[in-house]
C-alpha cells in the first residue's frame, strides 16, 4: 500500500497528463520560459500568431467571396515570390503560488475583502 501522499500525487498527475506533456504542448504553441523559486513559479509564454486570426473578416475582398473581378488589374506584371502573412506576438504571463506542481489552491481575495467590509462596516 502506497502512502497517502504518493497516492494523491499519482492521481493528480494522471488527471491532465504529466507535467512534461504540458510543457511540450506549450513549446508547440510558442516559446516558454519557466523559473521556479521557493513556493513561486513564474511562466512566460510568447506565441507568434498570424495577425489576421485576431481580426474578424480579415479576408473580405469580393474575390474571396466568389465574385469575378472586372475592370483593369493594377497588380504587378511579373510573378513575385510569396511572403509570409503579417504576424503578431501574444504574451502570456502566469505566476503560481504554492508548490512546484503549479497553483493547486486558488484563493479569491475579493471574497475576503467583501467579508471584511461586511464585518467592520467600513468601505
From Swiss-Prot:
<feature type="transmembrane region" description="Helical">
    <location>
        <begin position="101"/>
        <end position="121"/>
    </location>
</feature>
<feature type="transmembrane region" description="Helical">
    <location>
        <begin position="39"/>
        <end position="59"/>
    </location>
</feature>
<feature type="signal peptide">
    <location>
        <begin position="1"/>
        <end position="24"/>
    </location>
</feature>
<keyword id="KW-0812">Transmembrane</keyword>
<keyword id="KW-0732">Signal</keyword>
<dbReference type="GO" id="GO:0016020">
    <property type="term" value="C:membrane"/>
</dbReference>
<keyword id="KW-0472">Membrane</keyword>
<keyword id="KW-1133">Transmembrane helix</keyword>
<protein>
    <recommendedName>
        <fullName>Putative uncharacterized protein YDR417C</fullName>
    </recommendedName>
</protein>
Amino acid at each position: 500500500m502506497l502512502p497517502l501522499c504518493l497516492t494523491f500525487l499519482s492521481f493528480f498527475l494522471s488527471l491532465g497528463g504529466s507535467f512534461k506533456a504540458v510543457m511540450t504542448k506549450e513549446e508547440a504553441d510558442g516559446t516558454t520560459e519557466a523559473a521556479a523559486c521557493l513556493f513561486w513559479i513564474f511562466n512566460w509564454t510568447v506565441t507568434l500568431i498570424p495577425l489576421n486570426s485576431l481580426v474578424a473578416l480579415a479576408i473580405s475582398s469580393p474575390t474571396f467571396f466568389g465574385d469575378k473581378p472586372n475592370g483593369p488589374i493594377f497588380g504587378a506584371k511579373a510573378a513575385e515570390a510569396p511572403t509570409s502573412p503579417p504576424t503578431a506576438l501574444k504574451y502570456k504571463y502566469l505566476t503560481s503560488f504554492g508548490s512546484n506542481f503549479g497553483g493547486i489552491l486558488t484563493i479569491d481575495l475579493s471574497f475576503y475583502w467583501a467579508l471584511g467590509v461586511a464585518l467592520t462596516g467600513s468601505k
